[in-house]
Amino acid sequence: MDYFTLFGLPARYTVDREQLASCYQELQRQFHPDRFASQPEREKTLALQQAVTINDGYQTLKHPLKRAEYMLSLHGFDLANEQHTMNDNAFLMEQLMLREELECIADKANPEVALADFAARLNGMIKTRSQLMVQQLDEQQWEQAADTVRKLRFLDKLQQQVEQLEERLLDDF
């Protein structure tokens, strides 16, 4: 059973987060291992496995990029385990330049302002690519969506580096 079916959701990228959370809580109540403490070992094991599946499914569907990767996996694109190399040289060059720019921010006269500007530009890039990804997934353009998700992974990692630098700058302040 796929995660969308498990949570009673249509198999599409846009999910009703309230319905997801509500169903998650209900499934957690039904399959909580404590409810099976007095059951035979086999029942306990099955309940524990189901609880793990419920948690994994919830975390996957809750996180936008993981949800997109999961949808693609349902259509034969296993991005989580692939050794695919990026063929978009322009995108790769842009990533190199962005990473170099980020590395230089801490040495600037006003690094907080420079980082805020950088983060705003990065958020714009992520928003644009995310909108494209949603459209591609909705239109079942799996190959194109997979390529966009690969690019979003780069941007997501860069955003994590921005957050780390922000924390370092705050610690130094």
Curated annotation (Swiss-Prot):
Domain J: 2-74
GO molecular function: ATPase activator activity; protein-folding chaperone binding
Gene3D superfamilies: DnaJ domain, HscB, C-terminal domain
HAMAP family in the record: HscB
Subunit structure: Interacts with HscA and stimulates its ATPase activity. Interacts with IscU.
Family (UniProt): Belongs to the HscB family.
Designated name of the protein: Co-chaperone protein HscB
Species this chain originates from: Photorhabdus laumondii subsp. laumondii (strain DSM 15139 / CIP 105565 / TT01) (Photorhabdus luminescens subsp. laumondii)
Gene name as annotated: hscB
